[in-house]
């Protein structure tokens, strides 16, 4: 029989007690009551925050956001398809609000709304993170918009100028060139030290691929980040995509850089949010949108700002895009976003179909801020342009009914047609501001009145080429002084007369 030694046993027990790890892990765990349509109802999560990330225990480790905090359950929107989440499975609260990695390494990359690369170029090694939803800068942290953001589109830079830190809405029906205006603006930032973020919401993957290849072709991808929430992705990802874009831009803005964010388009984000809200059984309002759809967009667009020098003087310019139905700008989402932004560029389907591209309706397009940032040279030449075009449009409508017109009216019509012609522009070919100044100067001062309408385009191209190759001092003077001084005006007149001679006018 084996002798039992009590002292040995007591030593072993004492050792076990000494080595016992007393650390207790407390987790807030709930149970899935119901799941479907990208929504889960969870019971038992008593201490969850609004907007907190929740971890589901399925094969994909699906993450959700707690949006509805009700008395007996929590409504969770899923950031995945959630096909393997079962009724009765457990859910753990993470104690974190949605955040993403940020850094310079994201430049030139295509990422999803969780900032995970989807371009097969590897995972960027970044240390910094930012909350997807963060507070907009306060009044004291801002300064007035004081620098121009050149789009390279003559009609916009002359009549609807955009400044750094402004929110300018691009609005119009489908297929009127809204994305083209935004892409031209990105392409024109080459060499301007502006970081661009293009957010594609609910678009076809083929459309996003086309945008990326255009940017790559024009050498613009190196300073651009593309955030893509494609049409086949869950509504939750389409809803958070714009906030991800804003967070990526904010990282650069707070480092003192100028940034440009394009949200293409916020109509689809509002529709994704409406879908989520209706599935969560939130009460519907006008057009079945939830009551806080205004706040959805205002909290996003208020993050665009021109920071004061104490905060580094960085800026975030926002160009949200809204798609209208049959030109109806008085629908719910368009009126909301018009009231939040500092102006709008309205693109008209009728103008587009009649060959005027970019199809900007100058009558109802406006910039409420940017003119303060417009360079003086452009103000000097383009001051009368909007009025001239408005008078021309009125006369043109009248002349369709009048049989005989006096000479002055005929001259005004001829000039108006030429002004409209010089504002036409091919896509993906932005024009530098000094050349825009020269083109408008020639049009507004009647130098194109004798040129045949069919030759105006060639005349403008020849003038730009002459200034670029034979008279580079004109461009240098405009860029350095920001004014059209008498010397540069003489150079410009000489260039116009040289080109006119070549056209034997």
UniProtKB/Swiss-Prot annotation:
Keyword Chloroplast attached: yes
Origin superkingdom: Eukaryota
Topological relation to the membrane, as annotated: Peripheral membrane protein
SUPFAM superfamilies on file: C-terminal domain of alpha and beta subunits of F1 ATP synthase, N-terminal domain of alpha and beta subunits of F1 ATP synthase, P-loop containing nucleoside triphosphate hydrolases
Binding-site residues, ATP: 172-179
Enzyme Commission number(s): 7.1.2.2
PROSITE patterns: ATPASE_ALPHA_BETA (PS00152)
Alphabetic keyword roster: ATP synthesis, ATP-binding, CF(1), Chloroplast, Hydrogen ion transport, Ion transport, Membrane, Nucleotide-binding, Plastid, Thylakoid, Translocase, Transport
Required for activity (site feature) positions: 365
InterPro entries attached to this UniProt entry: ATP_synth_asu-like_sf, ATP_synth_asu_C, ATP_synth_asu_C_sf, ATP_synth_F1_a_nt-bd_dom, ATP_synth_F1_asu, ATPase_a/bsu_AS, ATPase_F1/V1/A1_a/bsu_N, ATPase_F1/V1/A1_a/bsu_N_sf
Subcellular location: Plastid, Chloroplast thylakoid membrane
Single GO MF descriptor: proton-transporting ATP synthase activity, rotational mechanism
GO-annotated cellular components: chloroplast thylakoid membrane; proton-transporting ATP synthase complex
Keyword Translocase: yes
Catalytic activity: ATP + H2O + 4 H(+)(in) = ADP + phosphate + 5 H(+)(out)
One Pfam family of this chain: ATP-synt_ab_C
Record text on subunit structure and interactions: F-type ATPases have 2 components, CF(1) - the catalytic core - and CF(0) - the membrane proton channel. CF(1) has five subunits: alpha(3), beta(3), gamma(1), delta(1), epsilon(1). CF(0) has four main subunits: a, b, b' and c.
The protein's role, per its UniProt record: Produces ATP from ADP in the presence of a proton gradient across the membrane. The alpha chain is a regulatory subunit.
Membership in a protein family: Belongs to the ATPase alpha/beta chains family.
Name recorded for this polypeptide: ATP synthase subunit alpha, chloroplastic
Species in which this protein is naturally found: Antithamnion sp.
Taxonomic path: Eukaryota, Rhodophyta, Florideophyceae, Rhodymeniophycidae, Ceramiales
Name of the gene encoding the protein in the UniProt record: atpA
């Amino acid at each position: 029989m084996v002798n039992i030694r009590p002292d040995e046993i007591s030593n072993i027990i004492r050792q076990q007690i000494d080595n016992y790890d007393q650390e207790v892990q407390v987790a807030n765990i709930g149970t899935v009551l119901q799941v479907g349509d990208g929504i889960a109802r969870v019971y038992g999560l008593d201490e969850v925050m609004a907007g907190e990330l929740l971890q589901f225990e399925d094969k994909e480790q699906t993450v959700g956001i707690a949006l509805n905090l009700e008395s007996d359950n929590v409504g969770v929107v899923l950031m995945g398809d959630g096909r393997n989440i079962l009724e009765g499975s457990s859910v753990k609260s993470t104690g974190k609000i949605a955040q993403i990695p940020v850094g310079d390494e994201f430049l030139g990359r295509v990422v999803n709304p969780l900032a995970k690369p989807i371009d097969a170029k590897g995972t960027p090694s970044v240390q910094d993170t930012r909350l997807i939803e963060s507070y907009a800068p306060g009044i004291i942290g801002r300064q007035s918009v004081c620098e121009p953001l050149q789009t390279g589109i003559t009609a916009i830079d002359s009549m609807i100028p955009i400044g750094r830190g402004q929110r300018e809405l691009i609005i119009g029906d489908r297929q009127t060139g809204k994305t083209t205006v935004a892409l031209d603006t990105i392409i024109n930032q080459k060499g301007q030290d502006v970081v661009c973020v293009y957010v594609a919401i609910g678009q076809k993957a083929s459309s996003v691929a086309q945008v990326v290849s255009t940017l790559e072709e024009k050498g613009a991808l190196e300073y651009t980040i593309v955030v893509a929430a494609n049409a086949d992705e869950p509504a939750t990802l389409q809803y958070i995509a714009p906030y991800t874009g804003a967070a990526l831009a904010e990282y650069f803005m707070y480092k003192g850089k100028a940034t440009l964010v394009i949200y293409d388009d916020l109509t689809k984000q509002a529709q994704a949010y409406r879908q989520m809200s209706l599935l969560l059984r939130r009460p519907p309002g006008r057009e079945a949108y939830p009551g806080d759809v205004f706040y959805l967009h205002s909290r996003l667009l208020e993050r665009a700002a021109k920071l004061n020098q104490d905060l580094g003087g960085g800026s975030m310019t926002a160009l949200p895009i809204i798609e209208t139905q049959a030109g109806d700008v008085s629908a719910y989402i368009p009126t909301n976003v018009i009231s939040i932004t500092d102006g709008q560029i309205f693109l008209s389907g009728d103008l587009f179909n009649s060959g005027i591209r970019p199809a900007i309706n100058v009558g109802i397009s406006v910039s409420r801020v940017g003119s303060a940032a417009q360079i003086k040279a452009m103000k000097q030449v383009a001051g009368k342009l909007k009025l001239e075009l408005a008078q021309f449009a009125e006369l043109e409508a009248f002349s369709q009914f009048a049989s005989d017109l006096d000479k002055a009216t005929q001259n005004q019509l001829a000039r108006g047609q030429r002004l409209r012609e010089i504002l036409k522009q091919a896509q993906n070919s932005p024009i530098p501001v000094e050349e825009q100044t020269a083109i408008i100067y020639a049009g507004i001062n009647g130098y194109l009145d004798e040129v045949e309408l069919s030759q105006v385009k060639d005349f403008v191209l020849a003038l730009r080429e002459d200034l670029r190759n034979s008279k580079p001092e004109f461009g240098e003077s405009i860029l350095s002084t920001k004014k059209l001084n008498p010397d540069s005006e003489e150079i410009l007149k000489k260039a116009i007369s040289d080109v006119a001679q070549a056209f034997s006018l």
